[in-house]
Amino acid sequence: MIELKNVSRRFGDTVAVDGVNLTIETGEVCVLVGSSGCGKSTTLRMINRLLPHSAGEILVDGEDITTMNPEQLRLNMGYVIQGTGLFPHWTVARNIAMVPRLLNWPRERIDARVDELMTLLDLDPSAHASKYPQQLSGGQAQRVGVARALAADPNILLMDEPFGALDAITRENLQLEMLRIQKQVRKTTVFVTHDIDEALKLATRIAVMDQGRIIQHDTPENILRHPASDFVENLIGKQDRGLKLMSLRPVRDLMANHTEPRQSEPGEHVLREEDSIRLALFVMLWQDLRQVAVFNAQGQETGVITRERIIQEGV
């Protein structure tokens, strides 16, 4: 658990963070979102003491971080930044192994962990471990950055706009990768972004910041349904909130189940159980379909979702 109690940060006469109170529960993904200069990255960097806070308290699992050794604190927190921050003269494997080496892990344990994380992040160790960062695509390099942050198995993961410099397709793929990995590793994660759609997709809870203050902290659904101010309403968008709500619910919630599984046919339009209702509606409208088959991770049909059911539900 991470707790910020009336935390502020000043740069001279400028107040960057102003009396922030925030509790991030163990295992949840808290996304800090807001416009540029609102204090979200400053808030993140105070958690691992890259920046000292000017007032208030920051507690990690009940312990005041000012009583902790800052180097040890950072070694126990994964940290991912935009642009990866990889060492260009180190191989992929050595970049990932950096923190375990600093913690004096045995070589065999380090090698096994590097292979495990590369496989988890869809990077073939035999093909990529000996490469250097400049030999990777942007998406591959960002995956290596995430692997490095997870290498020592920290309880807390801090991510400062990690996908902000990537193209839209790579960004979406990495967002899906993060959701998949979070289901497996369950890290307490603080994620900074200026993209409300990214926040809605990734967050357990969202903290909306403006002028150094948190003006709403709630679940994605509650923020969409009950914005706390005009600023929040403008941030999430007034015209497409219904579509954003559809993006939060998976197809499995509204599909009609089948008892006889089958494999999909070549060229057939299908959906995965974890795909959003918004995507289902888009496919139906684009292809002029009344229903679409839904398949599980094993490629077996588990049900269908219909246009009528989506309209009936009203999401």
Residue positions per predicted region:
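Helix-to-loop junction immediately C-terminal to a conserved catalytic motif
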Residues: 48
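Short helical segment in ABC ATPase nucleotide-binding domains corresponding to the A-loop/adjacent helical element
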Residues: 92-101, 111, 115
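Conserved ABC ATPase "signature" region
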Residues: 108-127
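Conserved signature/switch motifs of ABC ATPase nucleotide-binding domains
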Residues: 131-134, 152
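ABC ATPase "signature
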Residues: 217-218, 226, 304
